[in-house]
Each structure stands twice: as C-alpha cells, then as structure tokens.
C-alpha cells in the first residue's frame, strides 16, 4: 500500500495499481484481479474521506466522515532511529493501537487513520486482523499523477453513490452474482473462475453457491460498524 502525501490532500492506494495504470497507458486491456476496498482520498488533517471501491467491474466513489478520538499514552519505543509514541482509539467497531512520531510532522497515516500530532508509523486492531506498518519514506522528485489510480482507475471514472447504496451493491452482488452476463448473448462472452471457463447462464448458475461461499469466507471489513449481513 502507498500513502501518497501532497500539499493539500493525501491518497491511500494499492501499490499494484501504479503498475496496472502504466500498462493501461501503453494500451493494454486490464481487469482487476482483486477487490478495490482500501482506496482513500482526503484533505490533509480532515476526517472527511472519499472512498473508492469496485463492485462487479464498476468503479464507485462515496463520501464518509470518519472522526477518531485518540487517547495519547506515555509509552514510547524506537524504530529505525525514530522515536514513536503510543495512542489508542475505538473506531469502526474495533479497538486500534497506533504508534506515531513527532519527528515527522504530518498528521496522517494509512487508510483513514489521522489527526495524531505526527506521522503514524504503525496501526493495528486489537485482534490483529489488520496491521499497517510503515516500511519506507520516499520523497518523490518527479511528481506522479496518482489521480489515475484513485479518482479514475484502469480507465474507469467512478460513479458517485452513498454508503447505503454501496451496501446494497454488495448484497446484490451476493444474491445475483454475474448478473451483467445474464442479458448478454451466449457466445459473446467468457468468464474464468474457480478453474472453470464459463460461457453460458447454466455455467454461471453452477458456480453461484461456491461464489457466495467465497464471499462469506473472505468478508472481514475494516469497519465492522458498516458491515453488511449476508
């Protein structure tokens, strides 16, 4: 993951998207091999986030306000010559532990975590389901236009929706997977999933339960308070 800090805003996105974007710029046709769920843009030191997600090969954007109330503790430690200080918060249905450094005066961090008096180097939930750790800090001499992997992605412009609409999209994707193929003429499309090449509606029906089971088994949203019930 990349935390991309600019003068007025920050972006958080998958590093893999940079490579995919470069391929698209060279004329390649690319599709996602993974769900887009943690792509975020916000103004510096703001709790107002723009969330970018993909569902059924479409790209969406919805706003959210994600205020965090941090408790800064006296405990400190050192990491790569940086002095880190501990902080805690309960947010999104989870308890989080963070380590930030006053030596790097940016009140930002991974995903939606921010508003501590220094850059967040580490943050994880109490059950260790999610664990973000800063690997390196790089100053980019030639500015990369990361809007191509956030505000648009693989040539797709986002459709503006609400959180509620996003939740409905997730439920619909579970109840009616691959619905976009049902109206397409047989022989004009193909889909490879679960090591099977599907070319007709009957094939889609045969993998529906496996697809739904995969969704349930892999569903572990960062923000439990916004989770949908399958």
Task: State each model region's role.
Residues 1-76, 83, 96-97, 128-230:
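Extracellular or lumenal secretory-pathway regions
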Residues 76-79, 83-138:
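Glycine- and acidic-residue-rich phosphate-binding/metal-coordinating active-site segment common to enzymes
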């Amino acid at each position: 993951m990349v935390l991309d800090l600019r003068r007025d805003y920050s972006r958080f996105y998958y590093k893999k998207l940079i490579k995919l974007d470069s391929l698209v710029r060279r004329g390649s046709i690319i599709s996602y091999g993974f769900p887009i769920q943690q792509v975020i843009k916000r103004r510096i030191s703001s709790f107002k986030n723009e969330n970018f997600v993909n569902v059924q090969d479409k790209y969406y954007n919805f706003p959210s306000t994600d205020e965090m109330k941090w408790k800064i503790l006296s405990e400190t430690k050192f990491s790569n010559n940086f002095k880190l200080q501990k902080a805690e918060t309960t947010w999104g249905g989870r308890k989080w532990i963070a380590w930030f450094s006053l030596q790097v005066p940016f009140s930002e961090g991974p995903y939606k975590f921010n508003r501590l008096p220094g850059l967040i180097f580490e943050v994880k939930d109490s059950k260790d389901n999610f664990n973000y750790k800063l690997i390196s800090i790089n100053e980019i001499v030639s500015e990369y236009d990361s809007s191509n992997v956030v505000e648009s992605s693989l040539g797709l412009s986002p459709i503006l929706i609400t959180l509620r609409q996003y939740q409905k999209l997730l439920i619909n994707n579970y109840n009616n997977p691959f619905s976009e193929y049902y109206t397409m003429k047989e022989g004009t499309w193909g889909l490879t999933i679960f090591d099977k090449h599907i070319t007709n509606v009957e094939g889609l029906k045969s993998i529906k339960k496996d697809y739904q089971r995969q969704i349930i088994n892999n569903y572990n949203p960062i923000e439990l308070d916004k989770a949908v019930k399958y």
